[in-house]
Amino acid sequence: MSNAPFFTEAWQQMPDEERENYHRAVFMNMEGHYALQKRVEYFRGIMRHVGEGVFIGCGVRIVNPQFVSLGDRVQIHDRCTLMASTERGITLEAGARLKHGVYLDTEGGADGCIQIGRRVYVGTGCCLHGHSGLEIGDDSLLAQNVTITPFSHTFDDPARTIYSQGGRQRKVTIGRDCYLGMNVSVLWSADIGDGAVVGAGSVVVKPIPPLSVAVGVPARVIRKREGLSPAPTTPE
C-alpha cells in the first residue's frame, strides 16, 4: 500500500519552518548540480563571505558559519567539517581545496583561527587545529591524514588528571610552497619554512628551515632542496 496520501497530508500540515529544514536536509546530502547550487546559495546567506565559483560537497558540516570566509573557486568536498569556534574563525583563500573528510577546528580561546592560503591543497582525512592560530601559506600541499595541532597537554603532576592540568599552545605557521607527506604530524612547537618538504609519517617537533627536506620520528633535516628560494607564486 502506498504511503503517498499520508505523506501528502502530513506535508500540507507541516509548519513552514519544518518544511524548510526538511528541504535543507535533503539538498545538503544530495548529489547533482541543483543540490550544489542550493548548498552554495544557503551558505552564502549565512557565512561571513562566499566568493564566486565555490564548490561545497555533500554532507559538509559548518559550525558558526558567520565566522567562515571562502574565497573564489574554493572547493570543500564531501563530509568535511569546519568548526569555527571563535570570532577570528576560518578563512580559505582563493583556490584552496579541502578533500573528503577534512576536519578543521579553531578550538577555544580568543586567538583561535585557521587561515589557509591561495591554492592550498588539503588531502583526504587531514585534521587541522587552530588553538592559538594556524596559518598555511599559498601553494602548499598536505597529503592524506596530515595532523597539525598547536597545543600540547601538560602532565607534570601525576596526582592530577592530565585533562585538568591544561596545556601549552602557540601559533603554528606552515610556509608557502611546502609539501607535507601522508600521515605527517606537526606539533605545537614546530613551524615549517617556505619551500620545505616533510616525508610521509614524520613527526615534526622542531622548526624546519626553508627549502629543507626532513624525515623521521622526530623529523630531522637530511638535505636542502636545490635552488635559492621557493618557487614564485602561481599566477591567478
Regions found by a protein language model. Give the residues of each.
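Terminal amphipathic alpha-helical/low-complexity segments used for targeting or macromolecular assembly
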Residues: 1-53, 139, 145-146, 150-159, ...
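Short Pro/Gly-enriched beta-strand edge/turn motifs at strand-loop
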Residues: 54-55, 77
